[in-house]
């Protein structure tokens, strides 16, 4: 784990280091901590209503690599979700050791957020994901989410699990809409609904989870 700048974020560092993780998961924890970077300098706050440009900047910050080759999408999406919650660029991820092996989302959640995030019931299409997110925004004003997809189709690799993010954008005098963010990618970081649909067959398995303010 790399810490840059002053000691102004010692509370974050100590919280991450003090997580009570099962000893059986110690190797996974080491992989996560080795890849995780924490910015200790005071950062400029992003606005409450995030724009597409804000999200693109935040996603690029999170992917802290020169040459990205790692299966660290779970960590990237958790870092971005954490940063969006705090409206600051705080956490980022380098490539993970054993780059072809993904990370356990439950362990990542415990390290980043202090507990495993509650997961939605299974959604069968990206359209259902969009509907679920907008519904949760209407009811609770939740606006930032992590999406776990079980049937993501990646070039060369084929079908695999993949985590990415979604945020509800509220532009002035316009209807709120869902913007997907894939910080694992180095191009087209903000795919449209139609573009992201191309990575899935007609049916799939999707789960939505989000950080609960009361656990902060």
Swiss-Prot record:
The keyword Magnesium does not apply. Keywords: Plasmid, Virulence. Belongs to the SpvD family. Not known. This protein is involved in the virulence of salmonellas. This is Virulence protein vsdE.
